[in-house]
Regions:
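Generic recognition of flexible, low-complexity loop/linker segments
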Residues: 15-19, 43-46, 174-178, 211
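Short alpha-beta junction capping motif
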Residues: 22-70
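C-terminal substrate/ligand-recognition segments
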Residues: 4-6, 31, 211
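Aromatic-Pro/Gly-enriched surface loop or interdomain linker
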Residues: 1-24
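Residues that flank catalytic or metal-binding motifs in active/ligand-binding sites
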Residues: 2, 24, 60, 75, ...
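Conserved beta-strand scaffold positions in the cores of enzyme catalytic domains, especially
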Residues: 6-8, 55, 188
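Long, C-terminal catalytic modules of enzymes
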Residues: 65-66, 70-211
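Short loop/turn segments at secondary-structure transitions that flank enzyme active sites
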Residues: 5, 12, 34, 61-64, ...
Length: 211
């Protein structure tokens, strides 16, 4: 509707062409659910960002699982659901290492690269497909470093509509966490609120630590 020209980059292209591909662009926007990445993919995105590229993460539960690609066949992906994490199945002991590259699988967080280090936020909780809105932080409009982002946005809440769950914040929720790598100078523009208590929201397992 706005007439912006864009190119689509697949995960396969990101893995194999890496920074050579990303460096052609001033801005790279992730898809809605960029959950599975190889080390080469993360390296490319991180270097692109550090070299001045504009990396815009507009998804949820991103950069979560470490994967490996088959060296002998395009499109074949391996994932080991090791240790913790929200997962469809649990890998058995002895099955935590990838066959394709012999590296330890599981969460990128367990491999020393939590998503907060790359994009400032990471998944915190999961619930039903009940999506809600975001409320813009009042102090953001008075901050000249970031208030340009809200040029033309006159409302105080955004994200009321969506194809899944009828709102932008639902099912899997991300949050900032300086312990895991969110920069000290990060600015939170908006936060979701009013998630209904009847939706069974739970912390992801890796957040539930005890003695």
């Amino acid at each position: 509707a706005k007439g912006f020209a864009f190119d689509l980059i697949t995960d396969h292209e990101l893995h194999h062409e890496a920074l050579d591909l990303l460096s052609r662009y001033k801005c790279v926007v992730t898809g809605t659910h960029p959950e599975y990445h190889t080390a080469a993919m993360l390296d490319a995105l991180e270097t692109y960002r550090d070299q001045g590229g504009n990396l815009v993460y507009l998804g949820g539960n991103g950069f979560y699982w470490k994967i490996a690609l088959a060296p002998y066949r395009d499109g074949l992906v391996e994932i080991r659901r090791a240790e913790g994490g929200i997962r469809a199945w649990a890998a058995e002991p002895g099955e935590y290492y990838n066959q394709f590259d012999a590296e330890y699988g599981g969460l990128w967080r367990r491999n020393g690269r939590p998503p907060q280090q790359l994009v400032g936020v990471g998944v915190r909780a999961q619930g039903d497909f009940v999506g809600l809105y975001y409320r813009i932080k009042p102090e953001v409009r008075a901050n000249p470093d970031v208030n340009w982002i809200l040029d033309g946005v006159e409302v105080e809440t955004i994200g009321h509509e969506g194809f899944s769950g009828h709102g932008a914040a639902g099912f899997e929720l991300d949050r900032a966490d300086k312990r895991l790598g969110t920069p000290e100078n990060a600015v939170i523009l908006a936060s979701s609120e009013d998630h209904p208590p009847e939706a069974p929201w739970v912390l992801v397992p890796e957040e539930q630590l005890t003695h």
